[in-house]
From Swiss-Prot:
Ranges of residues in domain DRBM: 161-230
Main localisation: cytoplasm
Catalytic activity: Endonucleolytic cleavage to 5'-phosphomonoester
Keywords: Cytoplasm, Endonuclease, Hydrolase, Magnesium, Metal-binding, mRNA processing, Nuclease, RNA-binding, rRNA processing, rRNA-binding, tRNA processing
Binding site for Mg(2+): 48, 124
Protein name as annotated: Ribonuclease 3
InterPro entries: dsRBD_dom, RNase_III, RNase_III_dom, RNase_III_sf
Annotated Gene3D superfamilies: 3.30.160.20, Ribonuclease III domain
Function: Digests double-stranded RNA. Involved in the processing of primary rRNA transcript to yield the immediate precursors to the large and small rRNAs (23S and 16S). Processes some mRNAs, and tRNAs when they are encoded in the rRNA operon. Processes pre-crRNA and tracrRNA of type II CRISPR loci if present in the organism.
Length: 231
């Protein structure tokens, strides 16, 4: 038996789902590098787009169930961690997705089966294929199984850049992304002081100073988060 065909069968057994639509599964596992332009090949890029949304829904649903008292701003960073490229690639390795992928010879030769971007994209495509083949329940079952260990990791208290934290908080509140504006620059060229204002729709802006624009922006973001009780 062809090694890749065997790997596809092993993958189905590991995730606990036998695909009715074999072409759909094959497309989910086919990277865009396949095909030389003359031969049209249906790759997994569109499924990857759909799967990103399916995965986001399942992750949001699971987080809301696990942390019913958490606020949106508290759930947002966990959600971002669960659907990140790093996490999706790690899940792909756990499911041994790499050997089942269909890649071009050149991509395979340079280690494409172990590349985070390829593995993460294929994971999203697989979630879309599960949704289309077996409905949301089939996708949910696989998600809860493969991502089970990721929930604790997503909740680890890793230090975050204040600007990133503010962006996640704003998204969790359903607000537009923060905007930054330099209000003033004082001091000599060798020791400048920047005054920066950060604004988020619906709340008062925060102002802070720093020795560089970046430092001032971080300080302003931190000030706004702390004032809103999210820092």
């Amino acid at each position: 038996m062809d090694r890749r065909v065997a790997a596809v069968g092993d993958l189905e057994r590991r995730i606990g789902h036998r695909f009715e639509d074999r072409e759909l599964l094959e497309r989910a596992l086919t990277h865009a590098s396949v095909g030389d332009g003359a031969k049209k090949v249906r790759d997994n890029e569109v499924l990857e787009f759909i799967g990103d949304r399916v995965l986001g829904l399942l992750a949001a649903e699971a987080l809301a169930q696990r942390f019913p008292k958490a606020k949106e701003g508290e759930l947002a960073p966990r959600l971002n961690a669960l659907v990140s490229r790093e996490t999706c690639a790690r899940v792909a390795r756990k499911a041994e997705l790499g050997p089942a992928l269909r890649l071009s010879a050149s991509s395979s030769k340079i280690g494409g089966r172990e590349t985070d971007s390829i593995l993460a994209g294929a994971t999203e495509a697989l979630m879309a294929a599960l949704y289309q083949d077996g409905g949301l329940e089939a996708a949910r079952k696989v998600f809860l199984d493969l991502w089970n260990d990721e929930f604790d990791r997503a909740g680890e208290g890793r230090p975050r850049d204040p600007k990133t934290a503010l962006q996640e908080w704003a998204q969790g509140q359903g607000r537009p992304l923060p905007t930054y504006r330099v209000l003033d620059r004082t001091g000599p060229d060798h020791a400048p002081v920047f005054t920066v204002e950060v604004s988020v729709t619906g709340v008062d802006p925060a102002i802070a100073k720093g020795k560089s624009r970046q430092e001032a922006e971080k300080a302003a973001a931190k000030a706004l988060l702390e004032r809103e009780g999210a820092g």
